[in-house]
Each structure stands twice: as structure tokens, then as C-alpha cells.
Amino acid sequence: MPIQKPCAFINARSGSTSDITEPLTAKLKAKFESIGPVKYVEPAKMSEMISATIEDGCDLVIIYGGDGSALSAAKLATEKNVPIVALPGGTMNLLPKTLYDTVEWEEALDTALACETPRWMAAGDVNGNTFLCGCIIGTPTRLNEVREQIRDKHFKEATEDLIFNVMNFKSEDVFEYALGSSPDTYHEANLLNVICPQMSDFDTGPGGLEVNALDVDSIFDVAGLGLSAIASDWRENDHAETNISNELHVKGSGKIDILLDGEPTPMTLPLNLILIKKGVLVLAPN
């Protein structure tokens, strides 16, 4: 069934967004008889507003922000079988690049709206938490908070956290992981990079999660860690081991640091990661 009533939200705090409410509204009104809200909003209010517009009958959620913003919108929309359009307004924009092959929001929107029907896209899940691009597991992910503080010009806090992480990083802080639904062999690593099929340039066959396990020797080896790590070719690293699997288990107890689509999301071990073939509805070409 064709889209009848789209709505759009612009994350005011994403890496490269600006207030495009006027041109975005004009483009939507030129194509649809009825549209929902087109709002430039603070992140704290976005989830509530998206839920309200879906309840009000909007059947497409357009999100202009980063990959984390797209993830938040996708989780709310997919629960109601409503597709999303992820416009590139963040730092990395991995999802829009993959779906629409552009970093220009107007081109991405035109490509999306030219599609007649939405389609399912695979996603990953770790302990009930969805990710659309990738999941990075291990203590070195704490440096992502330093990166965000620098981007927000919180230099004092960033310096303090960097010193703390350098002083407390231990390369021997390893955990055990295993592949498959009934694992009998566990391996050791202190950093795992799990990439969704659509983000991987590796041959995943019929579709699977790309799992890169690394033994990071020094915190300086991951000084630039963030969402960009999902796009990096970690397979060239001498300490990396790459596998494809629909399921991954991580042993242990206590807290562990995780990045989901670039967003810090600490969790409690053990972890169970699975591929969800129908993970999120998107309005995008096949």
C-alpha cells in the first residue's frame, strides 16, 4: 500500500543537521495530500513525538540525524509496522549511505520516495537491544565518550576521562566468546566488532553477522574508536579473526562496555547476539 501520511523529525543535536523544516515540508507537500508534523526537535523529546505521530496515523517516519537517531526511530516505528527513511545528518551516516548511496539529504529523500513499497532490512540484536549498523563490545569503547565530549567542546571532562581510561586500560581484560546456537568452543578477545550484513563488504553468503574478534594490545591502538570502527577494514589487522555467524555468545558476569550504532550502551554479561532477518522496515531500493 502506498505511503499516505509521512512525518519528519530533525535531530537538533546530530553531527551535521540544520533546520530544514521549510524545504522538507515543501517537498513532502508537493508529493502527498496529507502530511504529519515536520519538526526540529531536541533528542530528549524525539521518541515521545514519534510515538504520538504514529498513533495519529502517520505511516512513514523520516528522520534527519545520525545513525543513532535512525536506530531510535526504527525501534519505535517497526513495532507498529511503519517504515523509516534515514536522511544523512550525522557524522558517519553509514545507514543512509548504504540505503541511498548518498550523503545529501534531498537526494536520499528523492530516492526513498521513489520506492513504491517498503522492505525489510536485517538487524542485529544483543540481549533485546537492536542495532542496524554494528555493535562493538569491550572496554576500549569507553573512548567513544571522550570523542563525544571533544565534539561538544567539553574539553576538561574529555581530558579527565582520557587520562582515566589510559591509566585503567588493561589489555589482559579479555572475555570468552563463541559462535553458533549451540557453541562448544570458546575463544578469547578483548574487543569484538559485529557488523550487520548490509554494512559488510565481506561475503556473508545468504546473510549473517560479520564478527571481528581482536586482541588490542594498547589503548592507543583504538584512540579513534567510534562508529567509524564499523566501517573500517579490521580484517587487515594482524590480531583480528573474522567469522560469519547468525548467533554469538559472550561469557562472563558484571558490566561490559558496548557501542550500538555508535551510542554507548553498557550491558551486563553474559551476552547473546542474534541476526534478525526482518529487523526494520525501510523505504529504500532493494
Task: Report residues per predicted region.
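ATP/NTP phosphate-donor binding region
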Residues: 1-61, 71, 75-79, 107-109, ...
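Catalytic core of DAGKc-family lipid kinases
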Residues: 7-9, 13, 40, 79-85, ...
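Short beta-strand/turn micro-motifs composed of small residues
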Residues: 10-12, 65, 215
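Short, solvent-exposed amphipathic alpha-helical segments in soluble enzyme
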Residues: 23-26, 78-79, 148-149, 227-231, ...
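Domain-scale detector for complete catalytic domains at protein termini or as standalone homologs
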Residues: 56-58, 166, 279, 283
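Structural motif
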Residues: 63-65, 87
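Conserved Motif II region of HX4D acyltransferases
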Residues: 69, 123, 262
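ATP/nucleoside-binding phosphotransfer catalytic cores, i.e., glycine-rich phosphate-binding loops
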Residues: 206, 213-286
